[in-house]
Curated annotation (Swiss-Prot):
Induction: Up-regulated in response to androgens. Highly expressed in the seminal vesicle where it is detected in luminal epithelium of the mucosa folds, and also in luminal fluid (at protein level). Not detected in other tissues tested. It comes from Mus musculus. The lineage of its organism: Eukaryota, Metazoa, Chordata, Craniata, Vertebrata. This is Seminal vesicle secretory protein 3A. Keywords: Copulatory plug, Glycoprotein, Repeat, Secreted, Signal. Residues 1-20 form the signal peptide. It is found in: Secreted. Residues 116-145 are annotated as: 5 X 4 AA tandem repeats of Q-X-K-[ST].
Length: 265
Protein backbone atom coordinates (compact mmCIF):
# COMPACT_ATOMS: atom_id res chain seq x y z
CA UNK A 1 0.00 0.00 0.00
CA UNK A 2 2.84 2.42 0.72
CA UNK A 3 4.24 1.90 -2.76
CA UNK A 4 0.81 2.58 -4.28
CA UNK A 5 0.45 5.90 -2.48
CA UNK A 6 4.00 6.82 -3.42
CA UNK A 7 3.32 6.11 -7.09
CA UNK A 8 0.08 8.11 -6.95
CA UNK A 9 1.84 11.10 -5.44
CA UNK A 10 4.48 10.92 -8.14
CA UNK A 11 1.79 10.71 -10.79
CA UNK A 12 0.02 13.77 -9.40
CA UNK A 13 3.19 15.82 -9.44
CA UNK A 14 3.90 14.94 -13.03
CA UNK A 15 0.37 15.63 -14.18
CA UNK A 16 0.35 18.96 -12.34
CA UNK A 17 3.27 20.12 -14.38
CA UNK A 18 1.77 18.88 -17.63
CA UNK A 19 -1.89 19.83 -17.52
CA UNK A 20 -3.27 20.64 -14.07
CA UNK A 21 -5.25 18.69 -11.48
CA UNK A 22 -8.91 18.52 -10.44
CA UNK A 23 -9.87 16.47 -7.36
CA UNK A 24 -13.44 15.28 -6.95
CA UNK A 25 -14.82 13.83 -3.69
CA UNK A 26 -18.12 11.97 -3.48
CA UNK A 27 -19.97 11.31 -6.72
CA UNK A 28 -19.29 12.53 -10.23
CA UNK A 29 -19.59 16.25 -11.00
CA UNK A 30 -20.45 18.21 -14.17
CA UNK A 31 -19.11 17.99 -17.71
CA UNK A 32 -15.93 19.39 -19.10
CA UNK A 33 -15.33 21.02 -22.40
CA UNK A 34 -11.81 19.74 -22.43
CA UNK A 35 -10.21 16.55 -23.63
CA UNK A 36 -10.01 14.07 -20.75
CA UNK A 37 -7.47 11.34 -20.14
CA UNK A 38 -8.21 7.99 -18.45
CA UNK A 39 -9.28 8.06 -14.79
CA UNK A 40 -7.82 6.31 -11.75
CA UNK A 41 -10.25 5.45 -8.88
CA UNK A 42 -9.11 4.60 -5.37
CA UNK A 43 -11.83 2.89 -3.26
CA UNK A 44 -11.74 1.22 0.12
CA UNK A 45 -10.49 -2.15 -1.16
CA UNK A 46 -10.07 -1.63 -4.91
CA UNK A 47 -7.99 0.16 -7.50
CA UNK A 48 -9.67 0.89 -10.90
CA UNK A 49 -8.45 2.31 -14.14
CA UNK A 50 -10.65 3.49 -17.03
CA UNK A 51 -12.57 6.38 -18.60
CA UNK A 52 -15.05 8.49 -16.74
CA UNK A 53 -18.01 7.17 -18.71
CA UNK A 54 -17.16 3.57 -17.72
CA UNK A 55 -16.81 4.38 -14.01
CA UNK A 56 -19.99 6.41 -13.39
CA UNK A 57 -21.46 3.61 -11.26
CA UNK A 58 -18.65 3.70 -8.66
CA UNK A 59 -19.66 4.30 -4.97
CA UNK A 60 -19.93 7.81 -3.64
CA UNK A 61 -17.18 7.18 -1.05
CA UNK A 62 -14.66 6.63 -3.82
CA UNK A 63 -12.16 9.28 -4.64
CA UNK A 64 -11.00 9.65 -8.17
CA UNK A 65 -8.41 11.83 -9.74
CA UNK A 66 -9.09 13.26 -13.12
CA UNK A 67 -6.25 14.55 -15.15
CA UNK A 68 -6.96 16.77 -18.04
CA UNK A 69 -5.10 18.75 -20.54
CA UNK A 70 -6.14 22.25 -21.53
CA UNK A 71 -6.31 22.79 -25.18
CA UNK A 72 -3.70 25.33 -26.05
CA UNK A 73 -4.00 24.60 -29.73
CA UNK A 74 -1.03 22.27 -29.68
CA UNK A 75 -1.58 18.54 -30.04
CA UNK A 76 2.04 17.85 -29.18
CA UNK A 77 1.55 18.84 -25.59
CA UNK A 78 -1.49 16.55 -25.27
CA UNK A 79 0.37 13.64 -26.79
CA UNK A 80 3.28 14.23 -24.43
CA UNK A 81 0.95 14.21 -21.41
CA UNK A 82 -0.70 10.96 -22.55
CA UNK A 83 2.67 9.31 -23.01
CA UNK A 84 3.76 10.40 -19.55
CA UNK A 85 0.57 9.09 -17.97
CA UNK A 86 0.92 5.72 -19.72
CA UNK A 87 4.52 5.41 -18.55
CA UNK A 88 3.50 6.22 -15.01
CA UNK A 89 0.72 3.65 -15.13
CA UNK A 90 3.07 0.97 -16.40
CA UNK A 91 5.55 1.82 -13.67
CA UNK A 92 2.72 1.63 -11.15
CA UNK A 93 1.69 -1.77 -12.46
CA UNK A 94 5.27 -2.95 -12.28
CA UNK A 95 5.48 -1.80 -8.66
CA UNK A 96 2.30 -3.72 -7.82
CA UNK A 97 3.62 -6.83 -9.56
CA UNK A 98 6.92 -6.54 -7.68
CA UNK A 99 5.09 -6.27 -4.37
CA UNK A 100 3.01 -9.34 -5.20
CA UNK A 101 6.15 -11.23 -6.15
CA UNK A 102 7.76 -10.22 -2.86
CA UNK A 103 4.74 -11.46 -0.92
CA UNK A 104 4.79 -14.74 -2.83
CA UNK A 105 8.49 -15.10 -2.13
CA UNK A 106 7.89 -14.54 1.57
CA UNK A 107 5.10 -17.12 1.57
CA UNK A 108 7.31 -19.58 -0.26
CA UNK A 109 10.09 -19.00 2.24
CA UNK A 110 7.66 -19.70 5.06
CA UNK A 111 6.53 -22.94 3.44
CA UNK A 112 8.64 -26.01 4.37
CA UNK A 113 11.12 -27.08 1.76
CA UNK A 114 11.05 -30.46 0.05
CA UNK A 115 14.02 -31.65 2.06
CA UNK A 116 12.22 -30.77 5.28
CA UNK A 117 9.12 -32.64 4.11
CA UNK A 118 11.24 -35.66 3.22
CA UNK A 119 12.97 -35.50 6.58
CA UNK A 120 9.61 -35.29 8.34
CA UNK A 121 8.32 -38.34 6.47
CA UNK A 122 11.53 -40.19 7.31
CA UNK A 123 11.16 -39.24 10.96
CA UNK A 124 7.59 -40.52 10.95
CA UNK A 125 8.66 -43.81 9.36
CA UNK A 126 11.52 -44.12 11.88
CA UNK A 127 9.06 -43.45 14.70
CA UNK A 128 6.79 -46.23 13.46
CA UNK A 129 9.78 -48.58 13.25
CA UNK A 130 10.86 -47.65 16.76
CA UNK A 131 7.37 -48.32 18.04
CA UNK A 132 7.39 -51.77 16.42
CA UNK A 133 10.91 -52.62 17.68
CA UNK A 134 9.96 -53.16 21.37
CA UNK A 135 7.50 -55.87 20.35
CA UNK A 136 10.16 -57.51 18.19
CA UNK A 137 12.67 -57.29 21.04
CA UNK A 138 10.17 -58.96 23.35
CA UNK A 139 9.73 -61.83 20.91
CA UNK A 140 13.52 -62.23 20.57
CA UNK A 141 13.86 -62.30 24.36
CA UNK A 142 11.16 -64.93 24.60
CA UNK A 143 12.92 -67.08 22.00
CA UNK A 144 16.22 -66.77 23.89
CA UNK A 145 14.56 -67.66 27.17
CA UNK A 146 12.88 -70.68 25.57
CA UNK A 147 16.17 -71.91 24.12
CA UNK A 148 17.89 -71.45 27.47
CA UNK A 149 15.11 -73.35 29.20
CA UNK A 150 15.40 -76.18 26.68
CA UNK A 151 19.18 -76.34 27.15
CA UNK A 152 18.80 -76.46 30.92
CA UNK A 153 15.91 -78.92 30.74
CA UNK A 154 18.05 -82.10 30.85
CA UNK A 155 20.11 -81.04 33.91
CA UNK A 156 16.93 -80.01 35.66
CA UNK A 157 15.38 -83.40 34.95
CA UNK A 158 18.44 -85.22 36.33
CA UNK A 159 18.47 -83.00 39.39
CA UNK A 160 14.76 -83.68 39.87
CA UNK A 161 15.43 -87.41 39.68
CA UNK A 162 18.10 -87.02 42.36
CA UNK A 163 15.69 -85.13 44.54
CA UNK A 164 13.13 -87.88 44.09
CA UNK A 165 15.75 -90.41 45.17
CA UNK A 166 16.53 -88.34 48.23
CA UNK A 167 12.85 -88.20 49.01
CA UNK A 168 12.56 -91.98 48.58
CA UNK A 169 15.48 -92.69 50.91
CA UNK A 170 13.66 -91.53 54.05
CA UNK A 171 10.71 -93.66 53.08
CA UNK A 172 12.98 -96.65 52.64
CA UNK A 173 14.60 -95.93 55.99
CA UNK A 174 11.17 -95.74 57.56
CA UNK A 175 10.25 -99.08 55.98
CA UNK A 176 13.42 -100.65 57.27
CA UNK A 177 12.73 -99.17 60.67
CA UNK A 178 9.32 -100.79 60.64
CA UNK A 179 10.94 -104.11 59.69
CA UNK A 180 13.50 -103.78 62.47
CA UNK A 181 10.76 -102.98 64.93
CA UNK A 182 8.89 -106.11 63.90
CA UNK A 183 12.05 -108.21 64.26
CA UNK A 184 12.65 -106.67 67.65
CA UNK A 185 9.12 -107.53 68.70
CA UNK A 186 9.64 -111.11 67.55
CA UNK A 187 12.91 -111.32 69.47
CA UNK A 188 11.17 -110.04 72.55
CA UNK A 189 8.51 -112.73 72.13
CA UNK A 190 11.10 -115.53 71.94
CA UNK A 191 11.45 -116.03 75.73
CA UNK A 192 7.72 -116.63 76.00
CA UNK A 193 7.91 -119.16 73.18
CA UNK A 194 10.82 -120.91 74.90
CA UNK A 195 8.85 -121.04 78.11
CA UNK A 196 5.90 -122.61 76.29
CA UNK A 197 8.17 -125.16 74.64
CA UNK A 198 9.63 -126.13 77.99
CA UNK A 199 6.15 -126.63 79.40
CA UNK A 200 5.21 -128.86 76.47
CA UNK A 201 8.40 -130.85 77.00
CA UNK A 202 7.54 -131.47 80.64
CA UNK A 203 4.03 -132.54 79.71
CA UNK A 204 5.37 -134.97 77.12
CA UNK A 205 7.72 -136.54 79.67
CA UNK A 206 4.91 -136.91 82.13
CA UNK A 207 2.68 -138.54 79.55
CA UNK A 208 5.46 -140.91 78.52
CA UNK A 209 6.06 -141.97 82.11
CA UNK A 210 2.37 -142.21 82.79
CA UNK A 211 1.54 -144.60 79.94
CA UNK A 212 4.17 -147.42 79.90
CA UNK A 213 1.78 -149.78 78.21
CA UNK A 214 1.41 -147.39 75.32
CA UNK A 215 5.17 -147.52 74.87
CA UNK A 216 5.30 -151.32 74.91
CA UNK A 217 2.47 -151.82 72.49
CA UNK A 218 3.51 -149.16 70.09
CA UNK A 219 5.23 -150.33 66.93
CA UNK A 220 6.99 -147.59 65.17
CA UNK A 221 7.22 -147.45 61.42
CA UNK A 222 10.54 -148.43 59.89
CA UNK A 223 11.25 -144.77 59.37
CA UNK A 224 9.70 -141.79 61.10
CA UNK A 225 10.76 -138.30 61.85
CA UNK A 226 10.85 -136.42 65.04
CA UNK A 227 11.23 -132.72 64.55
CA UNK A 228 12.73 -130.81 67.34
CA UNK A 229 13.64 -127.25 67.74
CA UNK A 230 16.34 -125.76 69.79
CA UNK A 231 16.15 -122.17 70.83
CA UNK A 232 19.41 -120.46 70.18
CA UNK A 233 20.53 -116.89 69.99
CA UNK A 234 19.45 -115.19 66.81
CA UNK A 235 16.21 -117.24 66.58
CA UNK A 236 17.79 -120.04 64.50
CA UNK A 237 15.77 -123.28 64.17
CA UNK A 238 17.47 -126.64 63.60
CA UNK A 239 15.60 -129.69 62.37
CA UNK A 240 17.02 -133.19 62.81
CA UNK A 241 15.74 -136.49 61.50
CA UNK A 242 16.87 -139.81 63.01
CA UNK A 243 15.96 -143.54 63.20
CA UNK A 244 15.57 -144.56 66.83
CA UNK A 245 15.24 -148.15 67.95
CA UNK A 246 12.02 -149.65 69.27
CA UNK A 247 10.86 -148.17 72.52
CA UNK A 248 13.21 -145.20 72.34
CA UNK A 249 12.27 -141.50 72.39
CA UNK A 250 14.74 -138.81 71.48
CA UNK A 251 14.25 -135.68 73.52
CA UNK A 252 16.85 -133.04 72.57
CA UNK A 253 17.94 -130.35 74.87
CA UNK A 254 15.79 -127.25 74.82
CA UNK A 255 12.52 -128.78 73.66
CA UNK A 256 10.84 -131.44 71.54
CA UNK A 257 7.82 -131.63 69.27
CA UNK A 258 6.29 -135.11 68.82
CA UNK A 259 3.84 -135.67 65.99
CA UNK A 260 0.91 -137.90 66.70
CA UNK A 261 1.17 -139.81 63.43
CA UNK A 262 4.69 -140.92 64.40
CA UNK A 263 3.30 -143.28 67.07
CA UNK A 264 0.56 -145.59 65.88
CA UNK A 265 -0.77 -148.92 67.00
Amino acid sequence: MKSIFFSLSLLLLLEKKAAGIELYAGGTKGHFLVKTSPLMFIGKNQFLYGHKEEQEEAPEESIFVQTKHHEYGQDADADMGGALSSQELTSLKEDIVCEEEDELAQQKSQLPSQSQIKSQTQVKSYAAQLKSQPGQLKTIGQVKSQTMLKSHGAPLKSFKARLNLREDIPQQVKGRGYGLAEDLAQVRQQPAKVHRLKGKHRQSRKTAAFYPQFRRRSRPYPRYFVQFQEQLQGSVHHTKSFYPGPGMCYCPRGGVILYQDAFTD
